[in-house]
Amino acid sequence: ELGGWDKKGVDRAPLAAGIVADNCPETGIDHCRRVVRMCQLAYDELGGWANEISKLDHDTLICGAVLHDIGKFLEYDIKDGKACHSEMGKYYNHVVSGAYIAKSNGLPDKIVHMILEHSDMQSPANTYDYPELMMMKKLDHMCFSIAWMAYPCK
């Protein structure tokens, strides 16, 4: 079983071990839910207009938002009550392991790419932007940055 997280533990999964302080009330699941809600709000506001000019696809946007941090369940662990990098997480960050999970479960390449490219850690150049990735990436970055500014790891 990859990651070793159970249903109870998933709710305690960290937002980002070593980057955001352990006392940050925003968990990884909270963050993913927030990114999904923000993507839905942005789509509701911009969807019709953005769809006319860029063919923004709602299902791709939301699927990418739901799964963008799926690899964190392989990257992180809880030891002695504190968030830390797992053995696998020492070698692969969450975008790599998340893309692996998505690809090995038959998800479309566009979703795999959204997982792989959503973080500036992996690809700051934005070599291939399409509207769903651009929107999700910017909203993810905004949500993460607010938590990080409020609870920086010292």
Model-derived regions: residue spans:
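Histidine-centered active-site/metal-ligand motif
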Residues: H31, H68, H94, A99, ...
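A broadly conserved amphipathic alpha-helix scaffold signal in soluble, globular proteins
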Residues: R37-Q40, D44, V96, Y100-K103, ...
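Divalent-cation-assisted or electrostatically stabilized phosphate/pyrophosphate-binding catalytic cores
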Residues: K82-S104, D129
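Histidine/acidic-rich helix-loop-helix segments that form or flank divalent-metal centers
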Residues: A50-E52, L56, L61-I62, A99-K103, ...
